[in-house]
Amino acid sequence: EEPQNLAARGGMLVASCLGGIAFLKGLGLVHAISHMVGAEYNTHHGLTNAIVLPVVLRFNLPTMEEKVKRMSDAMQFDDHSVESFISNIEKILDRIQIPQSLSEIGVPESCAARIAEKAMQDLAYATNPRLATFEEVHKLVLASIKKAR
């Protein structure tokens, strides 16, 4: 929005570095699902991650209240509850006009089971903070296709 704003650009640089550190800690279900969607439908990985993010957050965050408080604080959100955190993330996604479902970028419902099965074989799946069964991953994929937010 403000390419000449050095403070904002510096903040993005720090965020990029933190993202790299997070990458080393493990990627989880957002990436596992996105890897498989991208492989089959040639979607942009970052966009696919952004679409899937709210669905997986809803699945993961109830078991991560302490981390949600730290993330909310770092993002300067006033309310540190799980639901407020997800709501704030969704507002950001809306603001930058991220599609609200994978179907909007050409992913059909018919692939949900196949994507879920493949996602569970992805190395990123093993680092998800909450274990998920096939049925749970299938529901996450289907929700992401129909209406992620």
Residue spans of the language-model regions?
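Short alpha-helical scaffolding segments that buttress acidic/His motifs in well-ordered protein cores
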Residues: 12-19, 53, 89, 93, ...
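Glycine-rich phosphate/pyrophosphate-binding beta-alpha loops
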Residues: 17-49, 123-127
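Residue-level detector of well-ordered alpha-helical segments, enriched
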Residues: 8-11, 29, 48-52, 67, ...
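Gly/Pro-rich interdomain helix-loop hinge
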Residues: 40-111
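Carboxylate- and glycine-rich phosphate/diphosphate-binding segment that chelates Mg2+/Mn2+
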Residues: 1-25, 135
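Short coil/turn segments at secondary-structure boundaries
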Residues: 7, 84, 103-106, 130-135
